[in-house]
Regions:
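Short, Lys/Arg-rich flexible segments
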Residues: 1-118
């Protein structure tokens, strides 16, 4: 007695691909939202004079697996790491990006993990 079983691989392949696409979409969305959490923490740490620096901190989706959180002003770098004035004195850095990133690291990881395990 012989039993033959045949499986239509195209159905299985399509189902697997659909699930992979769904996971990729969820991961990209979770990553972007994680970037938003980091941006908010950086904005909260940002010193304010006119508010331009704080409002310039944005999230950009680079790819499905990468986001960039960055300020977009000419002077953001100098506020972050410090600088010398024309008279030669040193203005220390505020490290608002570094501190915001560090403060939000664990909550961002938890958020992304929770979105991918639903």
């Amino acid at each position: 007695m012989e039993i033959q079983i045949s499986v239509d691989k195209s159905d299985i392949t399509a189902t697997i691909q659909a699930k992979i696409d769904e996971i990729k979409e969820k991961a990209a969305a979770a990553l972007y939202q994680g970037g938003e959490l980091i941006a908010t923490a950086c904005q909260e740490n940002c010193p304010v004079d006119t508010g331009l620096l704080r409002s310039s901190i944005e999230v950009e989706q680079i790819s499905d697996t990468e986001v960039e959180v960055a300020p977009h002003t000419d002077y953001a770098y100098y506020v972050e790491v410090g600088h010398h004035t024309r008279s030669g004195s040193f203005v220390p850095g505020q490290f608002y990006m570094r501190n915001g990133t560090e403060e939000s690291r664990e909550s961002v990881a938890d958020y992304i993990r929770s979105q991918l395990t639903e």
